[in-house]
Amino acid sequence: MIDKYLKETCMLDYSNPAIQELIQKMKWKELDEFERIKAIYNFVRDDILFGYNEDDAICASKVLFDGYGQCNTKGTLFMALLRACQIPCRIHGFTIDKRLQKGAMTGLVYRSAPQNIFHSWVEVYFENQWYELEGFILDQAYLNKLQNQFPNCKGAFCGYGVAVKDFRNPTIDFNRNSTYIQSEGITQDFGVYYCPDDLLKEHHQQMSRLKGFAYRHIGRHFMNRNVKRVRQR
């Protein structure tokens, strides 16, 4: 039963040479299961920077090539690396309130964005239980800069890709626990799926063709510029 959560798919293309080369270079398969999950998690969180790709449906190897991603795309890469290293995983789909993206989204891009934005996290099967892992979305360097930008915020925070109850101490480190960074912004729950391919067949970002074109070619570049400004402060 659990074996299906190890299978390769079109989006989880872990036989891709670039992914296999990365796994060999990082020597993840030589680690015990806990350290393997933790090392892959930290790589996806901190080495794949927070940013906005052209589409949620890109494959894992494209996310690796881009070197950046958001919840859905970083999740795709995370799942591919986990499965390639014999760690069972699945995906859980949601929507989040667009207020969570304010700051990364600004001006017309924010005003024209759908109220509910497609979202997902990865669930990992380890020691006979499923862990909900969402805290890999923002790299630590970006989060640190954001915390420095809002030094007086001691409690809940919503914006710039964050929705948490404790802004100063979000649960983003995996140590046999679930991790979260956007969960306080969830508005709808679509349930769990075997792979992102299946999730996206049933649920995806609702927007017109024109808005989709504008996002891919204009909007996301403004958003990535806003993220870059936070990093440079």
Residue map of PLM features:
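Secondary-structure boundary elements
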Residues: 1-66
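His-Asp-centered catalytic microenvironments across diverse enzyme cores
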Residues: 2, 7, 11-14, 96-233
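Functionally constrained cores in energy, signaling, and assembly domains
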Residues: 27-30, 78, 121, 126
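Residue-level signal for well-ordered alpha-helical scaffold segments within enzymatic catalytic domains
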Residues: 42-43, 80, 84, 120, ...
